[in-house]
């Protein structure tokens, strides 16, 4: 424990918290333009073709973002909304593309966890028919 004299000479060091999504610059989401849309493979022990896009954000950063859900309509020059959130098995992917916002379509025929994938609520008759 330091003495008062030691604290006068050198004050306590502030703990700095490093951002997990620096490209967003303290914003909840950022708009960007897709520069490349492609698939990549996850690290061991997983195996798949994960859909990702390289996005140039309005903040000036170029980041790799994950496209969640089954199927997408993104291509080069699509305008997308990017949020934070990493993908554990894809190194370097620290952002997600928001489905159902700007040029990104929501996931078709999605009935569970719809808000996460930009899917509209199905009609009452359509939902009953899908269950049977």
UniProtKB/Swiss-Prot annotation:
GO terms for molecular function: rRNA binding; structural constituent of ribosome; tRNA binding. The keyword Ribosomal protein applies. One of its GO terms (biological process) is translation. SUPFAM superfamilies: Nucleic acid-binding proteins (SSF50249). The keyword Amino-acid biosynthesis does not apply. Pfam families: Ribosom_S12_S23 (PF00164). CDD domains: Ribosomal_S12 (cd03368). One of its GO terms (cellular component) is small ribosomal subunit. It comes from the Bacteria. Gene3D superfamilies: Nucleic acid-binding proteins (2.40.50.140). Keywords: Methylation, Ribonucleoprotein, Ribosomal protein, RNA-binding, rRNA-binding, tRNA-binding. The modification 3-methylthioaspartic acid is found at residue 89. Coiled coil: none annotated. PROSITE patterns: RIBOSOMAL_S12. Belongs to the universal ribosomal protein uS12 family. PANTHER family: 30S RIBOSOMAL PROTEIN S12 FAMILY MEMBER. Part of the 30S ribosomal subunit. Contacts proteins S8 and S17. May interact with IF1 in the 30S initiation complex. With S4 and S5 plays an important role in translational accuracy. This is Small ribosomal subunit protein uS12. The gene is rpsL.
């Amino acid at each position: 424990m330091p003495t008062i004299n030691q604290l006068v000479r050198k004050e306590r060091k502030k703990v700095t918290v490093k951002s997990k999504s620096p490209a967003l610059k303290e914003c909840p989401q950022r708009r960007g333009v897709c520069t490349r849309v492609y698939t990549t493979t996850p690290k061991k022990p997983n195996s798949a073709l994960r859909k990702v896009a390289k996005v140039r954000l309005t903040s000036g950063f170029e980041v790799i973002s994950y496209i969640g859900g089954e199927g997408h309509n993104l291509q080069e020059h699509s305008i997308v909304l990017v949020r934070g959130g990493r993908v554990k098995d894809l190194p370097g992917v620290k952002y997600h593309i928001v489905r159902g916002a700007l040029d990104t379509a929501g996931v078709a025929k999605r009935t569970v966890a719809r808000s996460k994938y930009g899917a509209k609520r199905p009609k009452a008759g359509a939902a009953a028919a899908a269950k049977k």
